[in-house]
């Protein structure tokens, strides 16, 4: 088994790739199958969020593995009105929904209840199978490390 222990911050020749959904790209420890069929173990620093295009390597640098963000079942909201998109972000964020935010577009894991809520705001929501790259705050180790004992309303 290949042990991937660090993320590279600059280009290297790629020896293999691994396609991972977001649920595995947020784990520091996991057993995964490379796209060529070999087994690999993720042994990464805690709190590291892997993105599509990231490069991982072994301690000795003998392997350089490219991370590919797997297509996932997502709801897609497209809208030219920044106010409506901001309103959607507010309501989804208030529910702690991991959210990918792009100019004129939002993505979140498909959820028909959330879809219906946003449609009531006048937004068009579609379903797709696309890579999901949420904002880091939804998944990094410090995103919810604060105590909820302080006063704020949800």
Regions flagged by a language model, labelled:
Residues 65-79:
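Short glycine-/aliphatic-rich beta-strand segments at the starts of folded cytosolic domains
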Residues 1-49:
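Intrinsically disordered, low-complexity, positively charged segments
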């Amino acid at each position: 088994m290949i042990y991937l222990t660090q993320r590279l911050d600059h280009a290297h020749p790629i020896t293999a790739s691994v396609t991972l959904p977001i649920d595995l790209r947020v784990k520091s420890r996991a057993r995964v199958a490379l796209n060529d069929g070999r087994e690999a173990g993720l042994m990464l620093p805690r709190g590291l969020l892997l993105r599509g295009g990231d490069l991982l390597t072994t301690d000795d640098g003998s392997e350089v593995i490219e991370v590919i963000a797997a297509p996932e079942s997502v709801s897609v909201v497209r809208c030219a009105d920044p106010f409506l998109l901001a309103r959607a972000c507010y309501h989804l964020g208030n529910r702690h929904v991991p959210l990918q935010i792009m100019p004129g577009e939002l993505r979140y894991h498909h959820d028909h209840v959330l879809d219906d809520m946003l449609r009531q705001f006048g937004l068009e929501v579609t379903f797709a199978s696309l890579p999901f790259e949420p904002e880091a705050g939804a998944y990094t180790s410090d995103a919810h490390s604060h105590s909820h004992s302080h006063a704020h309303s949800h």
